[in-house]
From Swiss-Prot:
Gene3D superfamilies: Ribonuclease E inhibitor RraA/RraA-like
Stretch forming the signal peptide: none
Keyword Cytoplasm: yes
Function of the molecule: Globally modulates RNA abundance by binding to RNase E (Rne) and regulating its endonucleolytic activity. Can modulate Rne action in a substrate-dependent manner by altering the composition of the degradosome. Modulates RNA-binding and helicase activities of the degradosome.
Organism: Haemophilus influenzae (strain 86-028NP)
SUPFAM superfamilies xref list: RraA-like (SSF89562)
Protein's name in the database: Regulator of ribonuclease activity A
Residue ranges that the Swiss-Prot or TrEMBL entry lists as coiled coil: none
Entry GO terms, CC: cytoplasm
Highest taxon in the source lineage: Bacteria
Subcellular location: Cytoplasm
Quaternary assembly: Homotrimer. Binds to both RNA-binding sites in the C-terminal region of Rne and to RhlB.
Keywords for this protein: Cytoplasm
Keyword Cytoplasm belongs to the record: yes
Amino acid sequence: MFIDTSELCDLYAEQVDVVEPIFSSFGGVSHFYGKVTTVKCFESNGLIAEVLEENGEGRVLVIDGGGAVRRGLIDAELAQLAVDNGWEGIIVYGAVRQIQQLENLDIGIHALAPIPVSADESSAGESDIPVNFGGVTFFPEDYIYADLTGIILSQEPLDLED
């Protein structure tokens, strides 16, 4: 279903938080939404891989990588895993790699920047905890909506038929 974050902001101005415009789109899908699942990690993506093994239908993975852009937390292999398991999208407060492959996958991916260096594969980090970046706090079970214009967050699902 097509979403327009500008229209959603107009309709639900009092209900949504707007993430600061620091992200770029790298995936093959320009707009996506779903229930938030969080991971907090630093320059490692083992825990991300574990979470992406889960059924992602109706879910968006929000990764707090501390804003670090020295290593790509998502690469083509992890993005394909997300597609295979039905994830709607991935938001990375950090870097991604293998951009040419990411843009051909059927998933939305927003991140700070691309870099060719891979993350380490340790499972260090935490999941399903509140994370804060971009001027908002993301709680597991919140709802996130993203397109090329921006990213918004709501505690309740928004009626996309309005």
